[in-house]
């Protein structure tokens, strides 16, 4: 665990924005060609359903996901999935703060950034107009198509949440449905509050779907229990389109397990740690820190 000291910076506008793109950086040791148009279209259709390739060259390929229609005030159209051509990867923008929260790749993150000199960037477009659950499943399907299209990919970086994962972990997962988005599109972060015994755990990535991220400010509980609670609550919020109202309670934790006998109160607040966003702050009762 890192002993580096970071400062709160809620003026940081560089971070992910609510409803922003689900942008994936695929990292490679060697340059890679754009797969041919027919192959890309076939694999996209296999994972996503009815697909139309509306642009294709060495620099970019674009696909309309015909089963996923975004509706706007002045009309509607299928959402788009874009894949860029291979480019050099210089590791810019990955500061110590971001690196400190790459929990899935702690053993490999420095090696990945050292060895991977090339990247392919992929992103969704117009998807902010979709319902949260539909977008979550589409983005997860898109990721699985990319993993199949680029077998030499070493690692995936998910810009919306700051997660870095080895490609083999993406390819070998056994997760189904919307929990795939929770696994790859939501990061649970952990911070010690300097000069105190307090800890802070929050999520980044739920706001991509216009859903609340979570925040816990606490002491004297195993942080791994809280991390598990955060992933479980995030999954519940996504699956049920955020049914939790301000001031309501949810099941707390006892001995590492969700427990109905313990109720923790929820309230909507602004995040304590960047990026600026709305969060569902979970008051952990006897374990809670900070004034509310």
Predicted ranges, named:
Residues 84-187:
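Internal, hydrophobic cores of structured domains that mediate oligomerization or house catalytic pockets
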Residues 25-28, 32, 127-135, 218-225:
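Conserved aromatic-histidine-acidic binding/catalytic patches
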Residues 20-30, 116-127, 282:
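Short, hydrophobic/proline-enriched secondary-structure or compact coil segments at domain edges
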Residues 36-40, 131-142, 222-229:
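Short amphipathic alpha-helical segments
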Residues 32-111:
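N-terminal low-complexity, intrinsically disordered segments
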Residues 159-292:
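Aromatic/basic-lined ligand-recognition segments
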Residues 1-44:
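N-terminal alpha-helical "arm" segments
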Residues 45-56, 141-156, 236-245:
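Structural alpha-beta junctions
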